[in-house]
């Protein structure tokens, strides 16, 4: 018998989040000070984008963009893939695998409530 493990039991929360008008420099500072590799971008608590360390390297550093004049909206990945809070860890694993993601935003009623990472999934599988 396989026990169904729900995402909300293993997700990281609370989640640092930013709005699309924040400067890239401020977003990087939040990521650095919080020791996180992802920042969801929200509007009315609903995820509209996501910024990862990889996004910053590819879209900012490599292109020599001004960190103070560029806002988060200009570098974020729009329409991020989300997963519902009551989905199973197996569903999260499938979504991560199919999309080559290491993180998924967790929503409840369309609003951001957490993040689940590949590391979280590995911890569940090894428990």
Predicted features and spans:
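The conserved cystathionine-beta-synthase
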Residues: 18-35, 42, 83-100, 107, ...
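Short, charged/polar low-complexity linear motifs in solvent-exposed/disordered segments
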Residues: 35-37, 66-68, 76-77, 86, ...
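Glycine-/small-residue-rich active-site loops that bind phosphorylated ligands and cofactors
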Residues: 16, 23, 48, 81, ...
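Short charge-dense sequence patches
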Residues: 2-12, 21-26, 40-47, 102
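A glycine-centered beta-loop-beta connector
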Residues: 31-34, 39-55, 96, 104-119
